[in-house]
Every structure is written in structure tokens, then in C-alpha cells.
Amino acid sequence: MRATVALALLALLALSGCESTQEKSAQLEKTAHHTHLAERGLTIARQSAEVSVLGAVLVHGSEGAAAVVTLRNDSAHALRDVPIAITVKNAQGSTVFQNNAPGLEAALTSLGSLPAHGMASWVDDQVPATGDPATVTAIAGVSPAVSGALPEVEVAGAHPSEESGSATAAGTVRNRSSVTQQSLVVYVVARRAGRVVATGRAILPEVAPGASVPFQAFLVGTPAGARLEASAPTSTFG
């Protein structure tokens, strides 16, 4: 199972000056640990009446599996920290994985934000391959509303790349807002003929106002010939 990781600022500054920005981004994904961990396992006591789960699919790769959940906000206000619970079953219908273990990073149990009347894809790339996972279902829990407009964050130039023989996607995140984005998650979904064939995510520890930061996401699945979709839901609201 490949861990998705983020580099702390001090480690980023310590990288050799001869490294390219892209190499630093790759090192960011490979060597650091996302520190926002859930102290307790995820429990959804009440399903959201504002968020619809439009679909949930499982993607298989050589080093594990990943779940992609498509969500829609049916309300007139933006939402933050949307809890998402997934249940993965094998072909016989037995549950083999749920994302409710204590210690999971927040990004593996929730979506940072969801715009009013907007849609988003959330990715859990830490689904173990043990137990022969075959299907996944998801529910979204109640989440707090955001007052005002969400800080604007955009992803540009998403394209296939390769790191140490592994399929990856690279691109740039730009923070167009005045709010520093902390622990910003970039989700990448690869579709071929409308079907999800690969997915992954990257975590950027910090994106300052007006800054552009490269990312690299390791992908689970087979992205060859697929169209990449990348997004970075707002994580910090000022």
C-alpha cells in the first residue's frame, strides 16, 4: 500500500539547491508524513441531507486499491470538513475494509470543502488489496456550512508523468485567495471512455496567497490514454 505523504517546510528548504522544483515536489510526496491524524475513528451518526453521493468506484493497481467517491452539494451554501465513510466488500459481500480506524489522516475520512451546488471527487488511495476488494459504497455525514465564498484555489496543467517506474500525475496548484492553504489535498482522477481507470492524491503542506506550487500524485490503476481531472478543494477558510 503506497502512502501519500507531504514534506514539512523545513525539509523542503533542506533539499539540495541543484534539484528542480519538480524533483522537490516528488520528494515531498515520497518522504514526509501528513500530521493531521484523526484521534478517534470515523463515526457518522447522521447522514447528510445536503450532500448526495453520486457514485463510488473501486480502482485496482499493482500495489493496492483506491476508492473514488463523487459528491454533490445540494444546498445553497458551501460546506467544509464533509465526513465520508466508505465500506469495501469482496465478491461474496463480506466487508474487508472501512475507513474508520483511529489514527487515519483527516483527508482519508473527509473532504475539505464542497461549493454550493457543486460537485467534487474524493479519493482514498489507502484501500488494502488484502481480502480481494470488489465493490465500495459511501455515505456523507453532516458538515458545517461556510459563511461567504470559498477561497479560490485552482489546479492547472495536470499531465501524466512517471516516478521510479510508477505512474504519476503532475501539475501546479495556485492559491488565488488571500488565505494561506494548509494541508491542501490535490485529487486526481483518470477517466477513459467515461470510466475511472486510475486515481491518486497529493498533499501540499502549505500554499501561500498568490503562490503557485507543483504537485505530483502517485496513481493507483492504469492511466495510459486516460483524461486526467485534478482538483484541490479549499482546506483553510481564514
Predicted regions and their residues:
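Bacterial N-terminal signal peptides that target proteins for export
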Residues: 1-6
